[in-house]
Amino acid sequence: MGDVLKAYFVPNGSYLMEMAEDGDKVSAVETLQGIGREIRDVLRPDATTMASPHWLPRSAFFVDDSAQHESFNDYPLRPAPFGRRFFSYSAAGDPVLARAIVASAREAGVPVGTKVYGLDHGAFCPLKVMDLGGIPTVPVSTSRRSFDECVRWGEAVRRAAQSAGRRVVVISPGNLTHRLDLRGDDERESYLPLGAKFDQIMIDLVTSGRSADIATIDPEMLREAAPEADGRPLYFLAGVTGHARGELLQYQGMKYSVGDATFAFEPAAAGVAR
């Protein structure tokens, strides 16, 4: 019987691939690797659905229904003296699941289309660190559409897993505070004080099953913290999981003022939501 087995909110910075390659003992990397083992060895899904926070069209939501997906390098490289590193990733697709997502969204009145897109680093970085190359994946966009539509988009993805008879793990990367504009050589290890406060509010919302209530946060704080994609990855997950509570697996206020958090979600029973 098809359904979403589990869902995850994970970090997606390209630095995670470097840390994993170097064997660094960093909580974000070790947690991603642990999730990868759980997906491969315990959950054993038919496919994953990956919603990159960097694929942000305005007109609609999109699905890549290709039979094969290749990564492309859209992330900034470090200056050559510090050792530039290119990474790549390939994964089989699942056109049947992809088409089911499109049909499910259309039936719900969610604007949707197909597009050959591939895997940007928001998608392939966590997939590579989790080592999920042997599992088919369906890349789907996030979107600049309304928060309500992002929730409905998540609901459509879950219904599609059910109708297609696919056992699916959904991964929606992002960061809490996301102020990369503050990076600088003199503050590489610092963290924005407001970011720590904002991140705790976000953690409290997600762990209490209120991921879709981000807009209730003070508007000025939201503007200053600038969560990745305005928090849309978490609205999407609220739809996917029936507003399930998220379990915080790790959190760190990273250098460059990034709130680096990982959550796992056990979806509510089909048809059950808060």
Show the residue positions of the predicted features.
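Non-transmembrane, aqueous-exposed alpha-helical and coiled segments at domain scale
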Residues: 155-163, 168
